[in-house]
């Protein structure tokens, strides 16, 4: 099964997510998402970037965070998710050595 990645130009991305170009520049500047091209005029974004921005917009609405706060929150959420997965894997490995009655 092939993976299909949808890409967006700056204009398409802004229309799809509802952010302005100014907000997009700030989001990229904060490292929340990264475009495919470093050249500002030719930025391309994938569907994963769109879902990250939509998640960021929910945080902005629900918690009234500014973009730097959203960047920190997303970083912490990703780290939390990574640690949960690591913990799950370690528990699986540990369960091999623990005998259950």
UniProtKB/Swiss-Prot annotation:
Pfam hit, one: MerR_2
Function according to Swiss-Prot or TrEMBL: Interacts with CbpA and inhibits both the DnaJ-like co-chaperone activity and the DNA binding activity of CbpA. Together with CbpA, modulates the activity of the DnaK chaperone system. Does not inhibit the co-chaperone activity of DnaJ.
Homology family: Belongs to the CbpM family.
HAMAP family assigned to the protein according to its UniProt record, in alphabetical order: CbpM
Name assigned to this protein: Chaperone modulatory protein CbpM
Organism of origin: Salmonella arizonae (strain ATCC BAA-731 / CDC346-86 / RSK2980)
């Amino acid at each position: 099964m092939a993976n299909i990645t949808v890409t967006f130009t700056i204009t398409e991305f802004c229309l799809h997510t509802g952010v302005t170009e100014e907000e997009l520049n700030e989001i990229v500047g904060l490292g929340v998402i990264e475009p495919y091209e470093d050249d500002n005029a030719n930025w391309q974004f994938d569907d994963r970037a769109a879902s990250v921005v939509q998640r960021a917009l929910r945080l902005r609405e629900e918690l009234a965070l500014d973009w730097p706060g959203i960047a920190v929150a997303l970083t912490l959420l990703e780290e939390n998710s990574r640690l949960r997965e690591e913990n799950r894997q370690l528990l699986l490995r540990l369960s091999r050595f623990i005998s259950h009655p």
